[in-house]
């Protein structure tokens, strides 16, 4: 059976149209629909300035040359430059962070629900990695990084960085969202508000319920 070229072109055009007809990714945790716009915000949480009123300061930020304070429980600090610091990033789908690590400090297991991350190590030695999804048997992809090395953390994957050196470490990372979001696994599981029922977590993690209660007390907001 011969198929006309015009039919093929029509079919391909329809497929291309369908491929482009997807919902944009949300830039906050949720967006509850309302009928009264007076009590609402735009889906990305930002209104746009009149382009004629834009100025250079809307696309500028400073301070990433300064080390973050790492005197905390995980001994690291993340300095974020996203749409909240640079309004001109709105709708551009990109942001940046500086991460400082004390010796043996870590950026604990976490995920960015809205962004892929690409990290470059500037100073020190890091052990980094991410874990793939259940469908991929939760494989660990990990490397030791030295200055100048680059590693990518795919969107949504749980990942971490640990300073395995005796000196401070510094890294910079780009994120494919103006507001990538961050979910720190231990904090949300054991420090949610209100707390998750400890019996649920005890069964999920195969722990004694008293151990879970102790963890929830430590991570309580």
Curated annotation (Swiss-Prot):
Signal peptide: 1-21
Main location: secreted
Covalent S-S links between cysteines: 31-48
Protein name: Germin-like protein subfamily 1 member 19
MF term (GO), any: manganese ion binding
Family listed: Belongs to the germin family.
Quaternary structure (record): Oligomer (believed to be a pentamer but probably hexamer).
Binding site for Mn(2+): 110, 112, 117, 159
Upper lineage: Eukaryota, Viridiplantae, Streptophyta, Embryophyta, Tracheophyta
Residues forming coiled coils: none
One cellular component term from this protein's GO annotations in UniProt: apoplast
Compartment(s) of residence: Secreted, Extracellular space, Apoplast
Domain Cupin type-1: 76-213
Stored Gene3D superfamilies: Jelly Rolls
UniProt source species: Arabidopsis thaliana (Mouse-ear cress)
Glycan attachment residues as annotated in the record: 77
Record-linked InterPro entries: Cupin_1, Germin, Germin_Mn-BS, RmlC-like_jellyroll, RmlC_Cupin_sf
Function: May play a role in plant defense. Probably has no oxalate oxidase activity even if the active site is conserved.
UniProt keyword list: Apoplast, Disulfide bond, Glycoprotein, Manganese, Metal-binding, Secreted, Signal
Domain of life where this protein originates: Eukaryota
């Amino acid at each position: 059976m011969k198929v006309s070229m015009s039919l093929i072109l029509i079919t391909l055009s329809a497929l291309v149209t369908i491929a482009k007809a997807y919902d944009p990714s949300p830039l906050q945790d949720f967006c509850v629909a309302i009928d009264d716009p007076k009590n609402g915000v735009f889906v990305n949480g930002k209104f746009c300035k009149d382009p004629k009123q834009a100025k250079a300061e809307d696309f500028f930020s400073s301070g990433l040359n300064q080390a973050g304070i790492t005197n905390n429980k995980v001994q690291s600090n993340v300095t974020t430059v996203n749409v909240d610091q640079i309004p001109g990033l709105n709708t551009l789908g990109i942001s940046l962070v500086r991460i400082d690590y004390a010796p043996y400090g870590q950026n604990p297991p976490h995920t960015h629900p809205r962004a892929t991350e690409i990290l470059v190590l500037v100073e020190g030695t890091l052990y980094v990695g991410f874990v793939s999804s259940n469908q991929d048997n939760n494989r660990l992809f990990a490397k030791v990084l030295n200055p100048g090395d680059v590693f990518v953390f795919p969107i949504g994957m749980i990942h971490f960085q640990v300073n395995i050196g005796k000196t401070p470490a510094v890294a910079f990372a780009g994120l494919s969202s103006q507001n990538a979001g961050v979910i720190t696994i231990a904090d949300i599981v054991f420090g949610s508000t209100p707390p998750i029922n400890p019996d649920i977590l005890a069964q999920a993690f195969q722990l004694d319920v008293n151990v879970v209660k102790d963890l929830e007390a430590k991570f309580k907001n």
